[in-house]
């Protein structure tokens, strides 16, 4: 029996716009797809107690996170009639304004792609062991809470 390969979703550093564009372009040959949904999570320059966030440093418990994401992926394919799902999460220090999460779902119909993308994002935020350390302009920090 063939051993299951778990997809690596982690990218060191920010997710670059060119990578996102390439991912979209690769789907032009998949003519059974009628709709895509994309979520891009971007680091915000929040002001907290008078201090501005300049970056978020993301860390994870890699194996646990990959196993959990594989479970989420399987559940999304079982629940929704999606053709493709791609998930990329940044690790390391990501500056305000840069993309740190990229979720891309595809289906024959737009509503399915949109619903699957939204649920996937919500589950990633709630269930994946990924932590963000908000780094302020003065180099102080606090641990981020997902919401």
Which stretches of residues belong to each language-model region?
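N-terminal, polar/charged subdomain of small-to-medium soluble alpha/beta proteins
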Residues: 1-99, 112-118, 122-147
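Helix N-cap motif at beta-to-alpha junctions
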Residues: 108-110
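Short hydrophobic/aromatic beta-strand micro-patches
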Residues: 104-106
